């Protein structure tokens, strides 16, 4: 299923990426990703994640695949959440390079908002990267306001 | 090492957004940013619920959730393992969070969106630090109990002061010396109740004495209308409530309004209501260019200072009503040492201009004209508060509440403008007019 071009561009821009998963007992877990590649035609998003920092999240995806991802622009809180099923792959060279670029641009974006590099460093970690390949099933508006939580696209 | 919630106080300041993850009964997770997480006690946190409706739905079916908190000083991340307990839509905690949300969201012009629907209480089962490649910084936190000692030191100073002016000074000097808070102002409510007027400040280029804030407007006005402290730890996204930072006396002369002082680069602000006998008397306001300059403990200590100052001020005003009754002896004053000066009074708003410089308006303006007229007529320079209060000429039924405050405002404003007429407080309930040169009094018609 095709992902809207504007949305794809938004997801690949310097936005904060947060991940939600759960274990077998339905206990949720939180993590951050350091970069996204959108494969529009396939309806897929690849996410670079540090397994060293977020081991429980990667284990949850390996176990059940259910994954929710919110992309939020720090300057104005414009946000979208995508949900679907994901698999874990080892990070290809392109994903390692992607994470590098993302960390650079994110640190400078947050720097413009007055956050020092030493403060944002713990959120932008590239140690032991893996790739989560998310097959998107639902897309929601998440920007704070009346439309928050509204479903904008659903793929069978 | 076990991490206690209270060790994470900085994470609850709302500087870096927190995150919550939940899961629906079918297992699908949900991940969302949170605007406010509040520390309730060592075992519970409260989350504001404005619009993250999927989160609210999920925890009602599956109460297990994860919350990620971030320390704004070093970026350190902490994962809380939480269980949803209940939703509150009233009570002290709800009110406190609603006010905080309103005060900060009216600043950014999204008051409507940020209406608080409920406060969700979660029990915290565990706290873990998220691995970080950068070493955690040893951030020096102020020693607990220090604020209490500082508040006691200010209270001592205030207790020694006996009139409105010295009480205001005792509070502001005390904040600077005992707390090391360098930018502060004290505003008192007008008896009409719609406005707060600055009667003293420290740390600003201009004192701003006589400047006004509407009750309900901005952080200061919200603390007044809600009668609760309002604190902001990161102003970087909040528009300044006063754009009048570059005020000049030309501007004052044109608008007959004195601009509120303020720091152009303020990052933290706190406003404390001053209440005595159940009546709001004013607001104590502090600001800093540092993020997180005022902790929750600071806020509590400052709230005590503000309330004690309110009680002292109420007492000082009440005592004045029983001040000396004897009208001072008519002194033969020949104070024609300086050059003459012109005092123009505009009756419609009681504004006063001395040699074309705006001084003040309203009741303090009327008071000055009254004193100068008697001075011209009788040559008298000594006055009692009692005779002013009883004066038929002033026709001020409401003035008895805060005559001292208005006289203080007039006195400080005359001082600040280095006017050729000055007001001195000689003893309790008595004032003296010092006039350098002959005053030419004029009534302006327009």
PLM regions with names:
Chain B
Residues 54-100:
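Short, structured beta-strand-loop surface elements
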Residues 27, 132-165, 281:
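Signal-transmission linkers at sensory-effector interfaces
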Residues 207, 264, 281, 287-303, ...:
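Regulatory loop-to-helix N-cap segments in sensory/regulatory domains
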Residues 357-390, 410:
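Short amphipathic alpha-helical recognition elements used for nucleic-acid or partner binding
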Residues 256-259, 267-275:
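A short, aliphatic-rich beta-strand micro-motif
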Residues 199, 206-262:
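Regulatory sensory and allosteric helical modules in signal-transduction proteins
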Residues 323, 359-360, 374-375, 404-446:
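DNA-binding patch around the recognition helix
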